[in-house]
């Protein structure tokens, strides 16, 4: 079986072309391949599949084998793969995901895709649709407690659940413990991705991400989108923000006229391999 290792700002994936390969047990396969000691090592597994409703279908599995509804970095990697490996000559693509169809425009340099602008769709803010257990419809600056410490979170779904927490200091947060406790907090029926954010200007912020089913990652596309939506809802930033993550920067814009979030960032091939 041939695979390709790719990443978006260090958020890395093993990509399999399911037009020619067959994966019998995707969750187990993801756990095996993504192990950084006994496998290839990655944050997740991406299966590039045929689709009856769009150009391609993306199936994503986290490193623990759980299903990811959407991935902003992963979808850019998929776009680079299908263009660079000749599965399409189109620069504008529609991709079927578990969270719906997403459209993206590839950025081409020297005949290769180097990144993409992705329409990440409508941010879901209703507590039930995220889901977050709450007596209120919107979860904005809402208290939550873990390890006898109180935080304020804003809940958003970008095709997967996010809890965004703003803080003046994020580098000293023990994310290995705090992130895990928050991910499995009883208020999140489907668990949650956690973002700790420090706003440095109306158009810039720094973010650390704890990804559901993975742990702390160098970047998270849906997390960056959720962070910007949350910062706008809390009147901390404008609608267009540069998000600095551990692995680099993403550009995010929440166009409130159409209520869609747009994400722009790079996609990089690391290597090909054979299993």
Regions found by a protein language model. Give the residues of each.
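A glycine-rich beta-to-alpha transition motif near the start of alpha/beta enzyme domains, typified by
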Residues: 1-112, 163-275
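Active-site donor-nucleotide binding/catalytic segment of nucleotide-sugar enzymes
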Residues: 155-158, 263
């Amino acid at each position: 079986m041939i695979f390709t290792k790719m990443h978006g700002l260090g958020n890395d994936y093993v990509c399999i072309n399911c037009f020619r390969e067959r994966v019998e047990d995707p969750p187990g396969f993801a756990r095996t391949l993504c192990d950084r000691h006994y496998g290839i090592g990655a944050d997740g597994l991406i299966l590039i599949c045929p689709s009856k409703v769009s150009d391609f279908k993306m199936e994503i599995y986290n490193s623990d084998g759980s299903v990811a509804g959407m991935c902003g970095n992963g979808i850019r990697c998929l776009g680079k793969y299908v263009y660079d490996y000749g599965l399409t000559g189109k620069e504008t693509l529609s991709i079927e995901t578990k969270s719906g169809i997403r459209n993206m425009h590839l950025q081409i340099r020297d005949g290769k895709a180097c990144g993409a602008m992705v329409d990440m769709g409508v941010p879901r803010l209703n507590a039930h649709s995220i889901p977050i257990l709450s007596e209120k419809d919107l979860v904005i600056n809402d208290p939550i407690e873990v390890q006898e410490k109180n935080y304020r979170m804003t809940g958003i779904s970008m095709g997967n659940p996010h809890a965004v927490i703003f803080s003046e200091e994020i580098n000293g947060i023990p994310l290995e413990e705090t992130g895990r406790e928050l991910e499995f907090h009883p208020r999140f029926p489907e668990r949650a991705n956690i973002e700790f954010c420090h706003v440095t200007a109306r158009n810039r912020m720094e973010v650390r991400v704890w990804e559901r089913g993975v742990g702390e990652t160098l970047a998270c596309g849906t997390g960056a989108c959720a962070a910007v939506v949350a910062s706008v809802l809390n009147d901390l930033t404008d609608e267009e923000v540069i998000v600095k993550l551990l692995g680099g920067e993403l550009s995010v814009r929440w166009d409130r006229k159409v209520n869609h979030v747009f994400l722009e960032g790079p996609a990089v091939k690391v290597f090909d391999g054979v299993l």
